[in-house]
Structure formats: structure tokens, C-alpha cells
């Protein structure tokens, strides 16, 4: 059985929107951000900063 904090803050993977490579693993708070997370991060495959979107 998962702990209560794991239910509220699940682990998510962020993928580059241009090359689709999954570069980052992080957690998010479901209560504050129920929709998909989008962050501008550096992609080593593209060699530049791109938008990384939450994958399921």
C-alpha cells in the first residue's frame, strides 16, 4: 500500500516536445497542478532549451 504522501506527490517523467526523449524525473503536487506539467528545460539530445511535458 502506497503512503499518503506518494498519493499526493507522484513521480512523473518529463519528455522533450521536439525529440520526445524522456530526460527528467521529478515529483509534482496533484492538488496544486492537476493538469499536465510543462517546464522549459535543457535537452541534451537537441542541444538547447525546449519545452518538456509530463508523460503518463
UniProtKB/Swiss-Prot annotation:
GO biological process terms, semicolon-separated: translation
Keyword Ribonucleoprotein: yes
UniProt-listed Pfam families: Ribosomal_L33
InterPro entries: Ribosomal_bL33 (IPR001705), Ribosomal_bL33_CS (IPR018264), Ribosomal_bL33_sf (IPR038584), Ribosomal_zn-bd (IPR011332)
Keywords, in A-Z order: Ribonucleoprotein, Ribosomal protein
Lineage: superkingdom: Bacteria
Database matches in SUPFAM superfamilies: Zn-binding ribosomal proteins
Record-level GO cellular component terms: cytoplasm; ribonucleoprotein complex; ribosome
Sample GO molecular function, one term: structural constituent of ribosome
UniProt xrefs under Gene3D superfamilies: Ribosomal protein L33
Similarity annotation: Belongs to the bacterial ribosomal protein bL33 family.
NCBIfam families, sorted: PRK00504.1, PRK00595.1, rpmG_bact
Protein name per Swiss-Prot or TrEMBL: Large ribosomal subunit protein bL33
Organism: Bifidobacterium adolescentis (strain ATCC 15703 / DSM 20083 / NCTC 11814 / E194a)
Organism ancestry: Bacteria, Bacillati, Actinomycetota, Actinomycetes, Bifidobacteriales
Amino acid at each position: 500500500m502506497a503512503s499518503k504522501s506518494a498519493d499526493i506527490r507522484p513521480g512523473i517523467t518529463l519528455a522533450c516536445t521536439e525529440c520526445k526523449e524522456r530526460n527528467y524525473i521529478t515529483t509534482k503536487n496533484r492538488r496544486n497542478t492537476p493538469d499536465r506539467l510543462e517546464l522549459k528545460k535543457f535537452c541534451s539530445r537537441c542541444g538547447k532549451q525546449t519545452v518538456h511535458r509530463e508523460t503518463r
